[in-house]
Amino acid sequence: MKLSLLASVALVPFVSAHYFFDVLVIDGKETRSNEFVRSNTRPAKYNPTKWKNIRDDMTPDMPDFRCNKGAFTFAGQTGTAEVKAGSKLAMKLAVGATMQHPGPALVYMSKAPSSAKTYEGDGDWFKIHEEGVCNKNADFTKDAWCTWDKDRIEFTIPADLPDGEYLIRPEHIGLHGAHDGQAEFYYTCAQVKVVGGGTGTPGPTIKFPGGYKKDDPSFNFSLWNGYKDYPMPGPTVWTGGSGSGSSSYSKVANVTSSDESSQSGASSSQGTVSTCPNKYNRRHARQFKP
């Protein structure tokens, strides 16, 4: 036990440069590590997925890009959390890490045909949340981004979402190397059963793999020459009601705050904009160089 704790503590500096999600938070209550979140089989669980300088023989063009490498092998032993439509959730990073790469966060969902435990994620995915830049007057390579130094992605289950079992796929994209084709993807899947929902038709939808392309501007974006609007990847956020079919790419979105406020938000979940102050105590890590 003591050795395991020491190993976890030793990981903290590194995984704040590289990291992974392992805890589902439901209405402010943290669940156990991997209780409802699928693990993966990567030798180093915190390694990102990339198109260039590939790690663990894993790219965004592979089926495992849905939930991470080998994640489906853990599906049967992973629990399925019951959550109410309209409830506030979060996906938290493991071992005290924080997101210390500049870039956006997105959250997707996909409905299982029956049980989430037997679903590989090969169906349609729709986006329920995204957040980009919260303060365009801050350092565009660091704390201009809403996710900077946070330990979780917070989002809301759409109130109009039909009941059923779903996969939730949180994703953080590190853009520090995107100018060189080295965008880094950090993601996983949680298993949930939605209750008390509505009759909406989620959309637009994409597939994983296939929804992201190597030459998409979102993944070849340079943040090293000052602020510029960032083109959000994927479809637009579903806010309830009827979706609009499939989509392979979203519109170019201005996701910045206003000039008047350094803390105005750019977080979109169910069509709302919220502030994103740093609310949690963080452990800082050494600077990562790609």
Curated annotation (Swiss-Prot):
Residues 240-290 are annotated as: Disordered. Binds 1 copper ion per subunit. Residues 245-275 have a biased composition (Low complexity). The keyword Oxidoreductase applies. Residues 1-17 form the signal peptide. It catalyses: [(1->4)-beta-D-glucosyl]n+m + reduced acceptor + O2 = 4-dehydro-beta-D-glucosyl-[(1->4)-beta-D-glucosyl]n-1 + [(1->4)-beta-D-glucosyl]m + acceptor + H2O. It holds the Pfam family AA9. Lytic polysaccharide monooxygenase (LPMO) that depolymerizes crystalline and amorphous polysaccharides via the oxidation of scissile alpha- or beta-(1-4)-glycosidic bonds, yielding exclusively C1 oxidation products. Catalysis by LPMOs requires the reduction of the active-site copper from Cu(II) to Cu(I) by a reducing agent and H(2)O(2) or O(2) as a cosubstrate. This is AA9 family lytic polysaccharide monooxygenase A. It comes from Aspergillus fumigatus (strain ATCC MYA-4609 / CBS 101355 / FGSC A1100 / Af293).
